[in-house]
């Protein structure tokens, strides 16, 4: 299991959000089945059944060991790398399910719905200083990991209260 950290960095029109207030208030944590992840440049196949599909950019944290109820001060021991990930969402299906007050996780949690880039190894000092620049035509958006609203350590500690994290 990987923990996907962060809110969408761009909307369906590929324009940057004006502010990252949503991220600053609380970082979103998504847990995904192993089959949702594609890595190493493997192709992503979008299912026909979902309708319109949007891509959402996220930050992925690679978990390096098994843990449960991890105190924040020890969280650094449980992850070793970061990557950018593209999460594909079936937005048409998600909207219909939300209107019907039905669970909409299947619109985001299907086989191959998350494509992770190459994980970059971290040192203890690097985590707060990482800056990610997204280039889309002429626009650039900068995301600083320290501006996610919660630190990665805090997110790992929170997630491990509710479920075991593992490699």
Task: Name each model-derived stretch.
Residues 1-166:
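Catalytic-core "active-site belt" of small-molecule-metabolizing enzymes
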